[in-house]
Amino acid sequence: MQITEQSSLYDDLEKKPVREILEDINREDQKVALAVQKAIPQIEQLVNLIVPRMKQGGRIFYMGAGTSGRLGVLDASEIPPTFGMPPTWIIGLIAGGDTALRNPVEGAEDDMNRGWEELTGYHINDKDTVIGIAASGTTPYVIAVSYTHLTLPTTPYV
């Protein structure tokens, strides 16, 4: 079993000077831009795959647990007001449902079957794209996205 919550720069925060904490956070934030820069070729491929599907009525599904799931739901909820798209085009699913947006739902991320059931409840089709979001890459609820490829081989999943 992989542990996602482990020792980090943020252990013993109460013992660190504020300046050190802020510098640590800033250093970590800088890693994000570099990671995105390295992934631009893969991101471009994904966008080029998704856009034609959406033009044919396809949807994007984000599936995540914990903070990763919350960020997927947040992103999906920002699409309608920001870009004027219908809320049914990009859908965020989080292990534990809406309750998990504000409160931890322990164990929900370990239920792969539940992830698959929630996804199939939307009647996914070959125009849809399913994107799993997991910091560890091993969250069972999120791994359910791989079932889409077995059931609908032309439906991309990430």
Predicted regions and their residues:
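Cofactor-/ligand-binding subdomain signature composed of acidic, glycine-rich
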Residues: M1-A35
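A short, well-structured juxtamembrane/interface segment
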Residues: K38-P52
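Active-site cofactor/substrate anionic-group-binding motifs, chiefly glycine-
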Residues: V51, Q56-D98
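A short, small-residue-rich loop immediately preceding and capping a beta-strand
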Residues: G58-T67, D126-T138
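Short glycine/serine/threonine-rich phosphate/pyrophosphate-binding segments
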Residues: S68-L74, S136-A144
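Glycine-rich oxoanion-binding loops at beta->alpha junctions
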Residues: P80, G84-V130
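Conserved small/polar residues in nucleotide/adenosyl-binding loops
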Residues: T148-T154
